[in-house]
Swiss-Prot record:
Involved in nucleolar processing of pre-18S ribosomal RNA. Disulfide bonds: none annotated. This is Probable U3 small nucleolar RNA-associated protein 11. It comes from the Eukaryota. GO terms for biological process: rRNA processing. It comes from Dictyostelium discoideum. It holds the Pfam family Utp11. The gene is utp11. Its main location: nucleus. InterPro entries: SSU_processome_Utp11. Belongs to the UTP11 family. Residues 1-31 are annotated as: Disordered. Keywords: Nucleus, rRNA processing. Residues 14-31 have a biased composition (Basic and acidic residues). GO terms for cellular component: nucleolus; small-subunit processome.
């Protein structure tokens, strides 16, 4: 076996780069090849970027509109964004007033829907659990002469068992119709309708409360904006938070 082959079989010592001599440290950092490669890549990337930018600037139309023209400005030669909240105090108050009116309209619409749902649920509940009404009379003669249609001001068809409520003749004249037993919903359908309606009622009440809270917060911020001062300042005193409020002296 030759000496060259034997040298390959022996463990080789890891190559180490020459350290920087103490005498040349004052001249600066001793650049290795890996440092040169990184520096060359960075230089080439910057050169290519500048070349592309110069090409774009050469072909750019000076009259071309760009939204940056109205959303930024030059401050000491540096482009800076224009603040979008530079509104006058009166404009902010008007915006908050419009928001409050919008929330009020939505809350009133929810109130009407809640009232309709509650009325519908009362009708369904009365259909699921019919109740009896007891009428007291003085003697047997009144019992014999008692007329339910006259007493309740209704029609005889109102007592056939298919109605959950007894309609008045005045309501019937307005156009209300007696429920047809053939088209009346079954007990299972009524239970399903009731469960769905109760769920919707709960969601609408929650939404109404959230709208009311948002409306109150907007009203409070609007009042504070008009006054120009905060109603209370919260500061930490030790481990507790204390709210300081300005009290008007008599």
């Amino acid at each position: 076996m030759s000496s060259m082959n034997l040298r390959r079989l022996l463990p080789q010592r890891a190559k180490q780069e020459r350290p920087q001599p103490e005498s040349s440290k004052k001249k600066g950092f001793l650049e290795r090849k890996k440092d040169y490669v990184e520096r060359a890549k960075d230089y080439n990337n910057k050169r290519d970027t500048l070349k592309k930018l110069k090409l774009q600037a050469a072909f750019k139309n000076p009259d071309e509109f760009n939204y940056k023209m109205i959303s930024s400005k030059l401050v000491d030669g540096v482009h800076s964004e224009i603040s979008k909240t530079s509104l006058k105090k009166e404009q902010i108050i008007d915006i908050k007033t419009q928001d409050i009116l919008y929330l009020q309209s939505k809350r009133r619409a929810d109130d009407k829907k809640i009232e309709r749902l509650q009325a519908t649920l009362q009708y369904m509940d009365s259909g699921l659990e019919p109740t009896e009404q007891i009428i007291y009379v003085d003697d047997e003669k009144e019992v014999k002469n008692f007329s339910a249609t006259k007493y309740f001001d209704t029609v005889p068809d109102a007592f056939n068992g298919s109605l959950s409520t007894i309609p008045k003749i005045s309501k019937l004249k307005e156009g209300s119709l007696v429920v047809n037993p053939k088209t009346a919903p079954t007990l299972g359908q009524l239970e399903a309708m009731t469960a769905t309606s109760y769920k919707e009622l709960k969601e609408r009440k929650l939404r109404r409360d959230q709208l009311f809270k948002a409306e109150m917060d907007l009203s409070k911020s609007k009042i504070q904006l008009k006054r120009g001062t905060k109603s209370g300042v919260t500061k930490k005193v030790g481990k507790k938070e204390v709210v300081f409020k300005q009290v008007r002296s008599k």
